């Protein structure tokens, strides 16, 4: 595969790289997933929030008297802290808190970590908007991936220098790390459709299908001719588009295969690194070093991993440039003004992308489902960890083991779901629905704890700590499927040539929903004083996207995406003009994309 094939498809715009996808390029794609997924699982999902809370705790005082340090240094302070803790426990739940002063405002150490991640998600959403559309143009895709990878990994390594006295710096580094992580994943995802489109397997299938069982697209409105095929959208006369089931199946299967393999590699590396991190914590704690130094060392190690594997991924991936940016944006301008122009261009592009997405019925249905689905996944993860730490009284090591169990199951899930799909001839959206139905077992099992005779047993319904581990296996299996199938499924529904912009919309939808579910769960916990009632909300939240995912038709979505790409006229420099959709008679055709297919 290194040498590619002899026949190259025609470029869709000037300077497009239509060279066949090589094994080297695929290794680069997998390598960055290997680098960044480790940080996402080990740092963001495990040790980073604990580190932030512990750094703040060492500078905090008990809420009960606002005098006693949270980390007592001598016997008297330890005795006072113990008495205060016992008294506060007797007064009622959740009154024994550790508070810290942040710029004149008193915050609990736990909420300090929560607010940090909330700010990170908000800043990440802004950054995604500002850079993703730019990644679709010129040679910025690979440059941005490298920039975010190096910046994020170095920021993680700098945690080694953050001592409790400057714990606020840890909050700043967290924001930088999370922003870089999210943006780099969006850019990496934008490579997936291009790798599939230029893969020799897909090109070979298209060559064999020409002149045989090609299925022409029906006109969007009467009197309109069919649009051009996906790989020749802006050249020559209108032609029939080959969207036969065989070609579509080839695209989708290859996309899912690449995505699943990437997720599996990332999860496998995450499990291995997490085991090493636990060993680092164990041995450093045995040495009696500072309580935050082991955690900071772990973050340094994870950041080093991210940096190390980013280097070969940048070397192996091609630029795969998109259409050039409009000349007026950058010629003869200073650096700052150029950056402002790029940012304004990106926000305008997002708004145009949203308007295009609204006109694509299948994309719109999927994004609504994805909003609910991603919110459910994020909320159930946070709720389960909180439930384990509070109501099941599980320690840090036990929770870390739970994380390893779930991640290991994710590896199995990423491998098994494609086998199940092939064995039973299931469509991609059917696999996603199966994953959601399996995930539904988690909150339903938690709700069993409300049934009187189950309570009388003393086991079942998440009354014992060991019951959460089988649920962790289920959660991991589901995540292994959803992580690969959702992004590959979405990639086939978007207009070609706008990959980064639409994957940014995909990520923004994900991040935008992540604050909704946890906030509602927080309100439920505040009102009831328990976490278990939140399982009822989670059961409903998981069920809502199931019918929407079932409704999505990938074949019709591909047809709509190709038509929409054809409606987006190309300027002389290869830049796609979104405004042409509304500024011409083709706007009526775009509206037709929202109609049901007969």
UniProtKB/Swiss-Prot annotation:
SUPFAM superfamilies: MFS general substrate transporter (SSF103473). It comes from Botryotinia fuckeliana (strain B05.10) (Noble rot fungus). This is Autophagy-related protein 22. The chain crosses the membrane at residues 28-48, 111-131, 159-179, 182-202, 263-283, 297-317, 363-383, 400-420, 431-451, 465-485, 489-509, 534-554. GO terms for biological process: amino acid transmembrane export from vacuole; autophagy. Keywords: Amino-acid transport, Autophagy, Glycoprotein, Membrane, Transmembrane, Transmembrane helix, Transport, Vacuole. Residues 228-237, 585-598 have a biased composition (Basic and acidic residues). Signal peptide: none annotated. Vacuolar effluxer which mediate the efflux of amino acids resulting from autophagic degradation. The release of autophagic amino acids allows the maintenance of protein synthesis and viability during nitrogen starvation. Gene3D superfamilies: MFS general substrate transporter like domains.
